Amino acid sequence: SRSMAPSMKAFFNAVHEVADDPSSIPARQVMLSEAESLTQSFNTMNGRFEQIRDQVNVDMGGMVNDLNSYAKEIAQLNVKIVADIGRAKGEQLPNQLLDQRDNLLNKMAKLIDVSVVEQKDGSISVFIGKGQSLVLSDYAATLSIKNSEYDPTHKEIFMDGQNISNQLSGGSLYGSLRFRDEVLDPSQRQLGLLATGLVT
C-alpha cells in the first residue's frame, strides 16, 4: 500500500482545500482530479492483487500436475519392484528401481508433506495430508484443482472428488495455499474496505 500513500495524501489535501474555501472552483476541480487519481490507484493495486492470484493459481495447477505424474510413476515402479523381488526370491534388490522411486518421493516431498509406509512385498504406500492415500501398491489417486464452490477466484485441491485443501501441510503447494489465504486475501479485503470507507 506504499504506492497508495501519495495519492491518498494528495486527495485529502485537496479535500481540506475545498473545506477551507467551498466556493473555490479551482479547489473543487483539483479535488475531483485527485479523487479520480486515487480511484485509478485503487484499481491499479487491485489489478496487481488479481495478477498475483492468477499466478498463484497457475503455480498450484503445475504442482498438482507434477504430483499426479510422480504418483503414477511410483505406482508403476511398485509393480516392477514387486515383480523383480519375486523373481529374485528376495535375494537381490532392484536397487536402480528403488533409487528411482526414492528420487520421485524426494521430488514429491518438496511439494507436499508425505508419509511413506513400506510393504512386505517391496511396494510402498504414500499418504498425504491427514492420511489420504495417494499411492497404494499399483494404484495412484488423482489430484485435481478446481474452483471453490464459495468463491470462483479461489482454487482448491481435490483428491478423487474430495476437497483436501485444509488437510494438507508442508511443501510448496501448501505454501501457496497459505500465502493466498493468509496474505493475499486479507490484503485485498483491506484494500476493498479502505476504498468502501472513502466512498461512504
Sequence positions of predicted segments:
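Structural signature of extracellular appendage/secretion-system components
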Residues: 1-200
